[in-house]
C-alpha cells in the first residue's frame, strides 16, 4: 500500500482530538451568576444588565420579575440592580434561573432562541428554532 494513504480511523481520531471542548458540551447557553453584594440595607447586583443581555430580555421586564419574586422594591441604575433589603447570592440566582425557565427557554426543545410576542390580548413565548408557541402571563 502506498504511504500517501492514511487509515480512516486514525484520521478520524486525529480530527476529533483537534476539536475544541465546547463542541462536546450539550449546553451552549449558560446564564452568568449574579455578582451581588450587600451595602447597608440594600443589595446590589453588579452584572444585572449583562445577564439581561445574555438572556435577551429587557432589563426593566427582567427586573420587574425579580422584584416581584423577592417581594421587595428596587430599581435598575446603570448596569446594576439595586434591591431594598438583604439578599444572598443563592436566592438571587434561584430567581434568575426561575425567570429563564419561564420566560426564556423553549418548553419543547429547550433552546434559548425565543421571543415574547403578542397576538390579540395574549402574550406568547415563541421559539425561533422549532416554532413552538406557549402562552405566558406577563408580570
Swiss-Prot record:
UniProt keyword Protein biosynthesis present: yes
SUPFAM superfamilies for the chain: Translation initiation factor 2 beta, aIF2beta, N-terminal domain, Zinc-binding domain of translation initiation factor 2 beta
InterPro entries the record matches: IF2/IF5, TIF2_bsu_arc, Transl_init_fac_IF2/IF5_dom, Transl_init_fac_IF2/IF5_N, Transl_init_fac_IF2/IF5_Zn-bd
Organism domain of life: Archaea
Keyword Ligase in record: no
UniProt keyword annotations, A-Z: Initiation factor, Protein biosynthesis
Molecular function, one GO term: translation initiation factor activity
Description of how the protein assembles with itself and partners: Heterotrimer composed of an alpha, a beta and a gamma chain.
General function of this protein: eIF-2 functions in the early steps of protein synthesis by forming a ternary complex with GTP and initiator tRNA.
Protein family membership: Belongs to the eIF-2-beta/eIF-5 family.
Name the UniProt record assigns to this protein: Translation initiation factor 2 subunit beta
Record lineage: Archaea, Methanobacteriati, Methanobacteriota, Methanomada group, Methanococci
